[in-house]
Amino acid sequence: MEIREFQNLIRQIYMDRDQKRGSDKTFLWLLEEVGELTRAYRRGEDHVGEEMADVLAWMVSVANLLGIDLETEVLKKYPRVCPLCSSSPCTCPFR
């Protein structure tokens, strides 16, 4: 599935509810999901992937509310090369 397809899927399923909730509260839900992901990762729990999926879905919901096309933004930021060194694979020194 392409990024745009996933964004459209989330829009179809959740946009009405997201609009009623508003962007501020939806963003807070995103932060809550990031917290759940952090806890699961730190504890070595087996549902880290599920928490990542939740974070992605809530991030997409926020993008939909803000009118942001994530596929366009991702390709602008990461044009098939590292945005810092312009190489693929990245040749930046480790940070």
Place the predicted regions along the sequence by residue.
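Flexible "arm" and connector segments at domain edges
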Residues: 1-52, 56-95
